[in-house]
Amino acid sequence: MDQAAQDNRIRSVVIVGGGTAGWMAAASLQRHFQGSPLKITLIESSEIGTIGVGEATIPTIRNFYQNLGLSDLDVMRATGATCKLGIRFNDWLKPGSSFLHPFGLFGQDLRGVPFHHYWLRLKALGDESEIGEYSLGASLAKGGKFTQPSRNPPSSLSVFDWALHLDASLFAKLMRQVAENAGVKRIDARITRVNLRPEDGFIASVDLDTGATVEGELFIDCSGFRGLLIE
């Protein structure tokens, strides 16, 4: 890397807001740039409470926390999570209607033709089977059952995936623990002013209610609906 490229590298990131978004961003960035000179600071106020709601995730959440060095059991124990095989949509087609969108495949492609074409053909011929009946994940969910998918691609048990339903506040707490253990700095304060660079309007620093000013090269707004930086 030449000197010009090195001089253009971002060396300080300031994340405004904690919660799941803020601490996930902090933990992920710290992990990705581990060993680099990048300094990550997260600013949040303990005076602003969080709501411990249930968080409905999709399977990619498991890739996310596994990249942080956490196992499924680590996260489930820390957040009281339960296994999730899909998402149910109520009243989408019409009032009283419902369908389950499972994580995984429907049926089996045949002769290079995607399975849903065969299902639509059956529908046209009068078959009343719902497409969910051809999904292992949907069938497991309907029966209140769960098993780990097979890691062997040819296996019929490899065609579905799963995620977690967890407590958002507990997951944020876990992400904070991971981030701080990796070196992220936390500042407990409220932001009173956002200072912009006159030459281009980019954020230069933020003033805190403690009287301190925090400078940064990249600012990430995770303050939710308040939009402290983006509004």
Where are the regions a protein language model picked out?
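Alpha-helix-centered segments that form part of catalytic cores
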Residues: 128-169
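The conserved SAM/SAH-binding core of class I Rossmann-like methyltransferase domains
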Residues: 16, 43, 189
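N-terminal Rossmann-like FAD-binding beta1-loop-alpha1 element of flavoenzymes
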Residues: 11-38
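Dinucleotide-binding Rossmann-like beta1-alpha1 core, especially the glycine-rich loop
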Residues: 52-141
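A short, basic/flexible loop-to-alpha-helix module at the beginning of a structural domain
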Residues: 1-10
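Predominantly flavin-linked oxidoreductase catalytic cores and closely associated redox partners
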Residues: 153-231
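Glycine-rich FAD pyrophosphate-binding loop
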Residues: 30-53
